[in-house]
Swiss-Prot record:
HAMAP family: IolC. One of its GO terms (molecular function) is 5-dehydro-2-deoxygluconokinase activity. This is 5-dehydro-2-deoxygluconokinase 1. SUPFAM superfamilies: Ribokinase-like (SSF53613). PROSITE patterns: PFKB_KINASES_2. It comes from Bacillus cereus (strain ZK / E33L). Catalyzes the phosphorylation of 5-dehydro-2-deoxy-D-gluconate (2-deoxy-5-keto-D-gluconate or DKG) to 6-phospho-5-dehydro-2-deoxy-D-gluconate (DKGP). The keyword Transferase applies. It catalyses: 5-dehydro-2-deoxy-D-gluconate + ATP = 6-phospho-5-dehydro-2-deoxy-D-gluconate + ADP + H(+).
Length: 332
C-alpha cells in the first residue's frame, strides 16, 4: 500500500529546496587526499543530487535555492538546466558568498571521506522573502534536507516552505542529511531536525541520524519501531530507516513495515548512495508504486551510483535501473 495522496494536475512533481554545492571527486583512488593531484568537478549537495536523480527518472522537477555570483554558481545553474530542472527560483547571492566545496577521498570502497569547505556559503543565505508560495503550491511534493536548517536565514526559509507546503497539500519529504560541520552542537541539530520532521509526511535517514535526533529524549534504549512510531503522532505517514549494507526498513502509520535489500555491485565509493536511493524511492511513490517496489528502485539506484565516480552525473534513468535490476543479484 502507498499511503501518500498526491494532488493531480500540478505542473511540478517535485520541488527541492536547499544546498547547492560543487563536488571535487579524487581521480586517483587507493590513496589519501594528501597524495591526490587531480579532481573532477560535479554538481553536489544532497537536495541537488536528489532533484537531478528525480529529473533523470522523468519527474518534472524544480529547485529553490541560492548560488554564488561567480563561475561556480553559473556552473551549478547551467547543469540543472541541462538536466531539465526548473531554475526560476534559484537566486543569485549579492553579498560575496561563495559556493560550498566538497573534496572526496577514495582510499578504498570501505574507506571514503569528504573534506568540506562550508564557510560563508551562498546556499545558506537563502532568505524567507525569496521563497515563493505560488511556486510551491504548483508541486505535488516538496523535498527538504537537514543541511539547509543549519543557519539563518536558510533555516527560516525552509520552515516557511514547509508552511506553504502544508497549506497547499504538498507532500513533504525530509531527507535528514546530517553533516556535523555545519552545526554548533548535536543538541542544536536535534531541535531543528525534530521541528522539521514534525511537519513532514515522509522522513528518510540512517539509524545514526535518527539516533542524533533522539539525543534530547530520555530513551533508555531505542529501536527502529520506537523511532518510527514517535513520528506517526504528527504528519508522518512513512519513516524510512537506512542501515547501509544491511538495507533499509520502511514503517507506515498503519503498523506495517517493509524491508528493502540491496543489489550486489562492484563498489567504487560509498558516498552518493543515500541521495540516489532517495531520488528513486521518491520517484516510485509519486508514480503510485507500492512501498516495497519503490524501495527496490531506491536500492538499485544506490547500487548503480556507488559503482560510479560521481554522484550527480551517475544518477540513472528508469531504463538503466530496469536493466540493472534484471541482471544484478538482489540481497534481502
Amino acid at each position: 500500500m502507498n499511503p501518500l495522496i498526491f494532488k493531480e494536475n500540478r505542473p511540478f512533481d517535485l520541488i527541492a529546496v536547499g544546498r547547492l554545492c560543487v563536488d571535487l571527486n579524487a581521480n586517483e583512488t587507493q590513496r589519501p587526499m594528501e597524495e591526490t593531484r587531480t579532481f573532477t568537478k560535479y554538481v553536489g549537495g544532497s537536495p541537488a543530487n536528489i532533484a537531478i536523480g528525480a529529473a533523470r527518472l522523468g519527474l518534472q522537477t524544480g529547485f529553490i535555492g541560492k548560488v554564488s555570483d561567480d563561475q561556480m554558481g553559473r556552473f551549478i545553474t547551467g547543469y540543472l538546466k541541462d538536466n531539465k530542472i526548473n531554475t526560476d527560483q534559484i537566486r543569485i547571492d549579492c553579498t560575496g558568498a561563495v559556493t560550498g566545496l566538497a573534496f572526496t577521498e577514495i582510499k578504498s570502497p570501505e574507506d571514503c571521506s569528504i573534506l568540506m569547505y562550508r564557510d560563508n556559503v551562498a546556499d545558506l543565505n537563502l532568505d524567507p522573502t525569496e521563497v515563493s508560495e505560488d511556486y510551491i503550491k504548483q508541486s505535488k511534493a516538496l523535498l527538504i534536507s537537514g543541511t539547509a536548517l543549519a543557519k539563518s536565514p536558510s533555516r527560516e526559509a525552509v520552515f516557511l516552505a514547509l508552511e506553504y507546503a502544508r497549506k497547499h497539500d504538498v507532500v513533504v519529504f525530509f531527507d535528514v542529511d546530517y553533516r556535523p560541520y555545519t552545526w554548533q552542537s548535536e543538541a542544536e541539530t536535534a531541535v531543528y531536525y525534530n521541528l522539521a520532521a514534525e511537519k513532514s509526511d515522509v522522513i528518510i535517514g540512517t539509524r545514526e541520524e535518527f539516533d542524533m535526533m533522539e539525543k534530547l529524549l530520555n530513551y533508555e534504549q531505542s529501536n527502529d519501531q520506537v523511532t518510527a512510531e514517535r513520528w506517526f503522532s504528527h504528519y508522518a505517514k512513512i519513516v524510512v530507516i537506512k542501515h547501509g549494507g544491511d538495507g533499509s526498513i520502511a514503517y507506515t502509520r498503519d503498523g506495517q513495515s517493509h524491508r528493502g535489500g540491496i543489489f550486489k555491485t562492484k563498489v567504487l565509493k560509498t558516498f552518493g548512495a543515500g541521495d540516489s536511493y532517495a531520488s528513486a524511492f521518491i520517484y516510485g511513490l509519486i508514480q503510485g508504486l507500492e512501498i516495497p517496489q519503490a524501495m527496490r528502485l531506491g536500492g538499485a539506484s544506490a547500487s548503480i551510483v556507488i559503482s560510479k565516480h560521481s554522484c550527480s552525473d551517475a544518477m540513472p534513468t528508469r531504463a538503466e535501473i530496469s536493466a540493472f535490476m534484471e541482471t544484478a543479484e538482489e540481497l534481502v
